Amino acid sequence: MTDYKDTLNLPETGFPMRGDLAKREPAMLKNWYDKNLYQQIRQTSKGKKTFILHDGPPYANGNLHLGHAVNKILKDIIMKSKTASGFDTPYVPGWDCHGLPIELKVESIVGKPNEKISAAEFRQACREYANEQVDRQKADFIRMGVLGDWDNPYLTMNFNTEASIIRTLAKVIANGHLYKGSKPVHWCLDCGSSLAEAEVEYEDKVSPSIYVRFKACDETAIETLFNAKGNGPISAIIWTTTPWTMPSNRAIAIHPELEYALVQLADERVILATELVESVAKAIEAESFDILATVKGETLQLLRFHHPFYAFDVPFIFGDHVTTEGGTGLVHTAPDHGTDDFIIARKNNIEMAGLIGNDGKFKSDVEFFAGLAVFESNEKVIEKLKETGALLKLARIKHSYPHCWRHKTPIIFRATPQWFIGMEKQGLRAQALAEIKTVRWIPNWGEARIDTMVANRPDWCISRQRTWGVPMAMFVHNETEELHPRTLDILELVAQRVEQQGIQAWWDLDPTEVLGEDAQHYHKVPDTLDVWFDSGSTYASVVEQRPEFNGQTADMYLEGSDQHRGWFMSSLMLASATNGKAPYQQVLTHGFVVDEKGRKMSKSIGNVIVPSEVWNKNGADILRLWVASTDYTAEMKVSHGILNSAGDAYRRIRNTARFLLSNLNGFIPARDEVKPNEMIALDRWAVSCALEAQNDIIEAYEHYQFHTVVQRLMRFCSIEMGSFYLDIIKDRQYTTKADSLARRSCQTALWHIAEALVRWIAPILSFTADEIWSHLPTVEGRSEFVFTEQFYSQLFTLNCHDKLDDNYWQQLINIRAEVNRVLEQARNEKTIGAGLEAKVTVYANDEMLPLLHQLGNELRFVLITSQAIVKPLSEADVAEGELAGLAVKVERAEGEKCPRCWHFATDIGTHAEHNAICGRCVENVAGKGEVRRFA
C-alpha cells in the first residue's frame, strides 16, 4: 500500500513546544544587550509623541522582593505597550541612595562616623555600599525583562543630582516656604533623628493606662462656677498611655462646647465630661458616683490646677481636638510631645518644657527623672504619682502605637529645633489641593486618599541629623539663627561645587571662601535633607534635566499604594512649592503582594516567594504573566499554586503560537499571501476576529487594565481560535494541495494572526514574543526585534456585503457546540469514537436552516464529521437539544476510513491509481486539488 504521509502538509517549526524559559531567557537578554535593544527602540521612536513614566526610585539596600518585581514589570508593560501604540517612551530607572538604612548597614561594617572612621570616609563607604546595592538590584531588574537606560540610570547620590536637590531647596526658600521652628516631630530613639510621616508604621503595643488627678488651686471658684458643693478635695482627671510625658505637662485641654460635670466620687470630687462619667467610673472601678452639677466647658476657661509632682500649676485651655470618644474629656497637654498639644499651647502662649535630649533621655537637670530613657521612666513616673496621691487608677492597655519602619521600635513625639516647609506659608496647602484635582488618579479612589492626607498633614520637617545625606548647605547667624542674607547665592555656589565633587564639598568648604569676613558671625547648618526631599525633587533633578524628556512634565508616576503619603506626596509638595504645579499628569497605584490567604509575606509564616526563585524555576515570563493577569488595584495574591496557574495560561498561549508558526511552514508572504477578497470565508472571519480582539486589547492597554488584556488574549486563544477556527482548519491545512488557494488562504490568515498576536503579548510575555518573532516568516524590511514595532495594522474586518458575517459565524459556533455535545453523548454510549466516525443529521428551524444550507457540503468540515446532512426541524425523529430550534442525530459514518485524511467515505477503492484513498484525497494528490469556498 502506498504511504501517503509525504503528500500531507504536516506542521513544522523550529519553535519548541516547551518554553524552557529559565534556560532560554538569559541568552535572549544577552542578545538584547549585545544589540543595544533599548537604543534601537529610542532610535525608531525618534520624533514621535513622548510618553514619560518617571521611575520612583527604590531604596538601594537589600534584596528585591515581589513588590519590587510587580512595580518594575507594570512599568515595563506600560512602556512597551506605549511604544507599540506609537509613542516615544524613554525609561530612565533610578535609585534612592542616601539615608539611614544605608548608614546603619555601613556602621555595622566600619563603625560610627567620627569614632573609628572620619565622617568623610564614612560618606565614601556609604557611596560605595550604595553602588554595590544598585548593581545587584539592577541585574535582577534586567533579568525580569525590563527595558530601560540601565547604563545611565539616575541615582540620588550622583553629583549632578545632589546639586539639583540643593537647587530645589533654594527654590523652596526663594518662594518663602521654609522656616525654622521647634515643633513636635516623630523621633526614633534608635535612629537618633526625626522621621517623615511615610517612615512611621503603626503596630500594637502594650502601654500603661493611667488616670491622674490634678488638684484644684481654688476649690471655691470651682464650687461657684458649678453652683454646687459636695465633700472632699476637687481634681481634674486626665487619662494617658504615656506616663513619661507627665513631667512635660503644661496645661489641660477641654472643649468649650462639651458639658462637664462636678462628680462626687466617694470622699473626693472630680471634674469629667458628662458623657464620660459612667465609663470613667467603670474604668476606675468606683462603687458609686453622684453628678453634683454640670456646666458648659466655656465657663471653665483658665481655672488652674496643681501639677501632680512639680511646684507649679497648669491652666484649663480650649482645644477643638478634645472629644468624648474616650478618656475623660480633659486632655493632658504636653506641648513638646504632640501636634495638637503644641498648636494649642502656642495659641495660649505656653512655653515648651524641653526636658528630653536627642538621645531620648531626660536631661540632667530634670527633677526626679534625670538621665532616664523615656520608656524606662514610665514606672518611675507612676511611682511618683502614687507617692503624691495623684494616681487614681493604673491598668495596662494594648493599642496601636507609632513605630519606626526600620527598627520596628516605638517612637516618640518630641519637640526639637528643625527646618520645616510650612503648609500654610504662601498658600502651599491650597495650591497642592488644587493641583490634585488636575491629575488622573488610577484607581480613582487615590484622589480622595491623597486629598485627605494633604488637607490634614502637618508642616513637613525636612531636616535630619544624619551623616549620609544631601546637606542643607545654609549658614545661620550665631546669635539670631537667621539665614545669611545671601543664602540663595551661597546655595548656588555650593551646588556648583557639589556638581563637581559630590556632597563632601559642603563639609570641606571653608566658610570664608563664600562668606568672607561674615564667616565669624555665621555657622554651617549641620543637618541633611530628609531622603523624601531627595526623591521628591526628582521631577527637577531628573525629568527636567535629562535630554530625552525634553523638559516635559511626567505623564505618569506609578508606585505602591503606600506612596500616597510617600513619594507622591513629597513630589507634589515640592513641585507645588517650586513650580506651582503637580509633577505628574497621571498617578497609578498598585496593591501589596500577599499570599493566597491574604497574609503579608513573612519569613515566620514561611510564605515568602523570592522573585529570583520564580525566574530560575519557571522563567521571568511566568512572573510577568502573573503580574499582568492580577488586578493590581487590590491586594495581589500569589502562591506557588497561583504561579502554576499562570504557567497553565502561558502554555495555552505558547501552544497557540506554535500551532500558528508550524502551519506557516513554507509560507512566504511576498509570494503566497492571498488578497482579502479572495480568501475563504472562514479565514476572512478569523482575521476579523483577530481585529476585534486587537481593538479590545489595545483599549485595555490604554486604560492600564492588563488583567483584561490577558483575559481577552486567553479568550481569543482558547475559544475563538483553539476550540473553533484552529480545530476546523487542520483538515484543510494538512490535506489540500500545498500551494492551493484553500491552504494559502488559511496560511494568510494564520500569518496575519501571528503577526498581531506576537505584538499583543510583547509587553507582557517579552521573552516569548522575541522567540516567536524570530520564527515568523521573513518579511522584507522587518525589524530585528518586535519591541521596535507598533501594533499590527494589516488586520481587516469582514466586507459589509459578506453574507457570512460575524453574526453568521457566531451562530455557527453555537450550533457546533450543540453538535459537539451530542457527539460526546454518542462517544460515551460507544456509538462512535472520534468525531470523524460520525454522520450527523442536523434538524434546524426556519431561522437556522438557511444558515446551514449556505455551507453546502462544507458543513461537515465545520462540524469535523465525515458526513453532515441538514433537514427541517419538522422532519426530526430526535428531540430538540439544549439549543432551541435544533435537533441533532448521530450515526456511524458511511463507508470506510481514508488512511490519508481519516474521513470516512464511500468512494474508497473506486480510483484505479489510488484505490486506498477517498476521491477528495485523490483530487488533492493527483488532480487540481479540491475547491473550498467557505471552510
UniProtKB/Swiss-Prot annotation:
Binds 1 zinc ion per subunit. Zn(2+) binds at C898, C901, C918, C921. It is found in: Cytoplasm. It comes from the Bacteria. ATP binds at K603. Keywords: Aminoacyl-tRNA synthetase, ATP-binding, Cytoplasm, Ligase, Metal-binding, Nucleotide-binding, Protein biosynthesis, Zinc. Catalyzes the attachment of isoleucine to tRNA(Ile). As IleRS can inadvertently accommodate and process structurally similar amino acids such as valine, to avoid such errors it has two additional distinct tRNA(Ile)-dependent editing activities. One activity is designated as 'pretransfer' editing and involves the hydrolysis of activated Val-AMP. The other activity is designated 'posttransfer' editing and involves deacylation of mischarged Val-tRNA(Ile). This is Isoleucine--tRNA ligase.
